[in-house]
């Protein structure tokens, strides 16, 4: 369970206990299909671990509380929640996500002057149009930004969610 100020649905690898016993079930889960259920927050934490050498900070909503005169009442102090994977795994995933932006399906996420990594996704939802996903990060001038975008029943992740993710990354890097 993610320690968070708001309720968060738990992720789910499989609804039926025997699904992950089969090689087909494992393969479907590995590429984000099958019975896997995740939220944008959970996926944003995965991308955060990628850019933080495998560690996940405890997520928070409010960074700072100020009085009307501008003085600080309270400021959030970032803490590490857990280690998701090793430094080496984080570097490998980061390199793959950057490669995807430079050469793969996520090329539309390029931002001039920034190092950008991304992963598009198109999640099947029965007989309905698929959910469009984009998970990405950008690094520029010492700033690291992570986004997770899902557009329910939006279609292709590369065509629908990626442009939204790129716009969010660019706005955050530009201080908007």
Where are the language model's segments positioned?
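Beta-lactam-recognizing serine transpeptidase/beta-lactamase-like catalytic domain environment
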Residues: 1-153, 157
């Amino acid at each position: 369970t993610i320690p968070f100020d708001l309720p968060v649905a738990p992720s789910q690898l499989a609804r039926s206990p025997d699904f992950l016993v089969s090689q087909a079930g494992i393969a479907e889960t590995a590429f984000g299909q099958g019975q896997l259920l995740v939220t944008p927050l959970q996926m944003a934490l995965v991308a955060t671990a990628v850019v933080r050498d495998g560690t996940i900070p405890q997520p928070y909503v409010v960074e700072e509380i100020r009085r009307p005169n501008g003085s600080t009442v309270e400021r959030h102090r970032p803490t590490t929640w857990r280690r998701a994977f090793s430094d080496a795994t984080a570097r490998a995933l980061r390199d793959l996500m950057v490669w995807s932006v430079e050469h793969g399906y996520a090329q539309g996420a390029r931002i001039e002057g920034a190092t950008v990594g991304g992963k598009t996704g198109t999640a099947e939802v029965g007989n309905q149009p698929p959910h469009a996903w984009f998970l990405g990060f950008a690094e520029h001038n010492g700033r690291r930004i992570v986004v997770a975008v899902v557009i329910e029943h939006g279609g292709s992740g590369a065509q629908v969610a990626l442009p939204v993710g790129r716009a969010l990354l660019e706005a955050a890097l530009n201080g908007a």
